């Protein structure tokens, strides 16, 4: 796809590693100036590597649960590079697995704040810039667990289902304004979080996906880049499953 994002500015949250880092690299390779919003200092390493490769990139320390922090991220992107054309709302955390009757309310609130409210805040403040420009593309990161049930997954499943319907609502709200909003719903992917799990757990995850393996972060990044690009100009409100067939069963 060459320079599909030439002269465009993309904000990617949660890009210190995994899907976010792969997405930041891919968008930069295709011409975008990339602004990474993350609390983790590893995001600075990603941005530095992109600059060393000749791309435009910077890291802005961002807490997606803090509205002022999110607003500052979007404003910095627009001020530094002249516009804000693409948002990839990827920042998220996992949950402590437990049945609902053993719910840790503090942990529930933390997951909802980061995985759902954080996406909403990023959209809110990206849309300030996109609405003024009359164009833009937002890609939120949901999950297969936003579409299907899994035992002992309360907060994460609720948050990711919320992201999916938040995406649909925003999509129909802003489509006529030249702003497209879509989401990806990844299956189990070979991210650092998963890499730290026992081998038998990783094998079970892979076996649940008809394709028989974990997704590579770069494969999910390709789907995100498609939805953010002009190639998806008529795609609005889609929740694109990138799950190796998990939700097709």
From Swiss-Prot:
Record-listed E.C. numbers: 1.1.1.438
Name of the top EC class for this enzyme: oxidoreductase
Induction note: Induced by CHCA, trans-4-hydroxyCHCA and 4-oxoCHCA but not by 4-hydroxybenzoate (4-HBA).
Residues passing through the membrane, by range: none
Keywords: NAD, Oxidoreductase
Pfam families found in the cross-reference section: adh_short_C2 (PF13561)
Entry's Gene Ontology molecular function annotations: oxidoreductase activity
Residue numbers annotated as active site: 156 (proton acceptor)
Binding residue positions for NAD(+): 38, 63-64, 90, 156, 160, 189, 191
Catalytic activity of the protein: cis-4-hydroxycyclohexane-1-carboxylate + NAD(+) = 4-oxocyclohexane-1-carboxylate + NADH + H(+)
InterPro entries, per the entry: NAD(P)-bd_dom_sf (IPR036291), Sc_DH/Rdtase_CS (IPR020904), SDR_fam (IPR002347)
Family membership: Belongs to the short-chain dehydrogenases/reductases (SDR) family.
Quaternary structure and partners: Homotetramer.
Protein task: Dehydrogenase involved in a cyclohexanecarboxylate (CHCA) degradation pathway. Catalyzes the NAD(+)-dependent dehydrogenation of cis-4-hydroxycyclohexanecarboxylate (cis-4-hydroxyCHCA) to form 4-oxocyclohexanecarboxylate (4-oxoCHCA). Is highly specific for the cis-4-hydroxy derivative and shows only weak activity with trans-4-hydroxyCHCA. Cannot use NADP(+).
PANTHER family, per database record: DEHYDROGENASES, SHORT CHAIN, ESTRADIOL 17-BETA-DEHYDROGENASE 8-RELATED
NCBIfam families per the UniProt record, alphabetical: PRK07231.1, PRK12826.1-2
Name assigned to this protein: Cis-4-hydroxycyclohexanecarboxylate dehydrogenase
């Amino acid at each position: 796809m060459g320079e599909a994002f030439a002269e465009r500015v993309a904000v990617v949250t949660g890009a210190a590693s995994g899907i976010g880092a792969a997405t930041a690299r891919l968008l930069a390779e295709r011409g975008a100036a990339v602004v990474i919003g993350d609390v983790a200092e590893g995001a600075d390493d990603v941005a530095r590597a992109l600059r060393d490769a000749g791309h435009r990139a910077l890291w802005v320390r961002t807490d997606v649960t803090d509205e002022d922090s999110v607003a500052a991220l979007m404003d910095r992107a627009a001020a530094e590079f002249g516009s804000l054309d693409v948002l990839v709302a990827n920042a998220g955390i996992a949950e402590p697995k437990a049945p609902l009757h053993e719910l840790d309310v503090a942990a529930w609130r933390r997951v909802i704040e980061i995985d759902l409210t954080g996406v909403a805040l990023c959209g809110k403040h990206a849309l300030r810039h996109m609405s003024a420009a009359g164009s833009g593309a937002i890609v939120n990161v949901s999950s297969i667990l936003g579409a299907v049930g899994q035992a002992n997954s309360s907060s994460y499943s609720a948050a990711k289902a919320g992201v999916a319907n938040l995406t649909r609502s925003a999509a129909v709200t802003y489509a006529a304004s030249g702003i497209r909003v879509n989401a990806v719903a990844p299956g189990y992917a070979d991210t650092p979080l998963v890499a730290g799990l026992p081998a038998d757990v990783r094998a079970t995850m892979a076996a649940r996906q008809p394709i028989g393996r974990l997704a590579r972060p770069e494969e999910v990044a390709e789907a995100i880049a498609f939805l953010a690009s002009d190639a998806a100009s008529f795609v609005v409100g889609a929740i694109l499953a990138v799950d190796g067939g998990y939700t097709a069963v």
